Amino acid sequence: MSQTVHFQGNPVTVANVIPQAGSKAQAFTLVAKDLSDVSLSQYAGKRKVLNIFPSIDTGVCAASVRKFNQLATEVENTVVLCVSADLPFAQSRFCGAEGLSNVITLSTLRNNEFLKNYGVEIVDGPLKGLAARAVIVLDENDNVIFSQLVDEITHEPDYDAALNVLKA
């Protein structure tokens, strides 16, 4: 199965399907800014916001990290995981320069399966191999309680919808 999103108005194909509310999140291991492996299970008992995007070096992606850094202070027992294919060095540099300390950046550097398993792998077009823009919210038991695959990659996600699920 696949889905279609758009990049600058042009259709691009995304492999698989984003997890839907009510489904169980798949386990994953990604790379932290210190190059250590970080697993989903390390956040057991906390709610998770997965802010998934192509690259921190684009304006819209950077804006989403800044916004989720701010929103992270508004919800309890919640971690915000910002996931991209960027090298951990770039993620760390960006967050350090911006003074962002309420989000955790994770890289798909050693795990391209994450993109496939979470239905965000762009498989054609100029962004082939990167992640489509998506937000997935998990409860304390890793059940999906909200997901959004953003139709136009150059647009920001629906922050209010994700926040409302966490405040419900």
UniProtKB/Swiss-Prot annotation:
A Pfam family assignment: Redoxin
Enzyme Commission number(s): 1.11.1.24
Domain Thioredoxin: 19-168
Chloroplast found in the keyword field: no
Any one GO molecular function term: thioredoxin peroxidase activity
InterPro entries on file: Redoxin, Thioredoxin-like_sf, Thioredoxin_domain, TPX, Tpx_CS, Tpx_Peroxidase_subfamily
Swiss-Prot/TrEMBL catalytic activity: a hydroperoxide + [thioredoxin]-dithiol = an alcohol + [thioredoxin]-disulfide + H2O
Keyword Oxidoreductase among UniProt keywords: yes
Top EC class, one word: oxidoreductase
Bridged cysteine pairs (disulfide): 61-95
Quaternary structure, from the entry: Homodimer.
Family: Belongs to the peroxiredoxin family. Tpx subfamily.
Descriptive protein name: Thiol peroxidase
Organism: Salmonella typhimurium (strain LT2 / SGSC1412 / ATCC 700720)
